[in-house]
UniProtKB/Swiss-Prot annotation:
Taxonomic source organism: Invertebrate iridescent virus 6
Tree of life domain: Viruses
Domain FAS1 per the UniProt entry, residue ranges: 36-171
Protein name: Putative FAS1 domain-containing protein 096L
């Protein structure tokens, strides 16, 4: 099946500041704003996005554990108090705007200048701090919870301890 999605998940997202519930994806050389259902539909067309599709599932937007529906996967897009995407060069701390990344399969989308470090917490207030390296294209951190262990998946990071993986290592092909 032919898909208009880019081959690399690293090139999938652009960011939109309208209404706090919009993600943009690269389609036909433009970056139109789409809602989660449209994103889901596009992912269904992508025969190389099996793992990514399963993690995203039908999506909703939530700012923390308490307002997320645990039966539905969450896309969390960080924003500042003026509803703009953050441009961060330092550490993100919980209770700032990443108060909780706790939903299995959660997708955490970073803006362009990715942070040096992010901290996330689960519903038991257990924290994980993880370093992120990225080029100036934005980045994504995919969060899963497995037996109380965090699995963070981000592009452009080499790691051998089983916690951080390269994108290519988690791609699933039909």
């Amino acid at each position: 099946m032919t898909s208009s999605l880019p081959e690399s998940i690293d090139g999938l997202y652009r960011f939109s500041s309208s209404r706090g519930s919009v993600v943009s994806t690269h389609l036909g050389g433009r970056f139109p704003s789409i809602n989660p259902d449209t994103l889901w539909s596009k992912l269904n067309e992508c025969d190389k996005c099996v793992f990514f599709r399963n993690m995203v599932s039908k999506s909703l937007y939530a700012t923390d554990y308490n307002n997320a529906n645990t039966d539905v996967k969450t896309i969390f897009v960080p924003r500042d108090s003026r509803n703009n995407f953050f441009n961060i060069q330092n550490e993100i701390t919980p209770n700032d705007f990443v108060s909780s990344l706790t939903i299995p399969g959660q997708l955490f989308i970073m803006p362009k200048s990715s942070p040096i470090n992010i901290k996330v917490q689960n519903k038991n207030k257990e924290y994980l701090s993880i370093n992120i390296k990225n080029v100036n294209k934005g980045g994504q951190a995919f969060v899963q919870v497995l037996d109380r262990l965090w699995i963070i998946v981000v592009p452009n990071i080499m790691c051998t301890n089983g916690i951080i993986h390269l994108m290519e290592e988690v791609y699933a092909f039909d």
